């Protein structure tokens, strides 16, 4: 089997997925600050439980404070991650499955748009939606 080709120096895939995983790890312990720390001041956020988009990190922080300490995820899977680079932006898409206590399972689709700013990547747009159940 041939050696794996190392990612190009300008390929943000590993860095962005690492940022996302670190934020998800904290989220699962009830700490939304991991996401706030990687969001740009002008981030926009869509959530299926909200009627409208949230504009700006300050507004997102106010919303996340209502959730602080209330999320408990025992483990999660970040499936099918794909990072597509477009200039100074990169789009991360993935499927997310979270497991709480017992057999509780929640399935999500996620799209995060990252922007390169000051040598680091920050989220400028985030969109979470429920994954439809598989029909048999």
Residue ranges of model-derived segments:
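A beta-strand edge to alpha-helix "cap/lid" segment located at domain peripheries
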Residues: 1-36, 44-136
């Amino acid at each position: 089997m041939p050696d794996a080709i190392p990612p190009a120096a300008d390929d943000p895939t590993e860095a962005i997925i690492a940022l996302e995983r670190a934020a998800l790890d904290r989220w699962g312990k009830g700490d939304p600050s991991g996401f706030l720390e990687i969001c740009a001041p002008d981030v926009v956020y869509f959530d299926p439980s909200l009627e409208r988009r949230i504009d700006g990190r300050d507004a997102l922080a106010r919303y996340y404070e209502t959730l602080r300490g209330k999320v408990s995820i025992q483990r999660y899977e970040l499936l099918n991650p794909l990072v597509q680079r477009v200039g100074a932006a990169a789009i991360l898409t993935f499927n997310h499955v979270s497991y709480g206590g017992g057999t509780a399972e929640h399935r999500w689709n996620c799209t995060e748009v990252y922007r390169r700013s000051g040598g680091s990547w920050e989220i400028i747009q985030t969109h979470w939606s429920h994954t439809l159940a598989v029909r048999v």
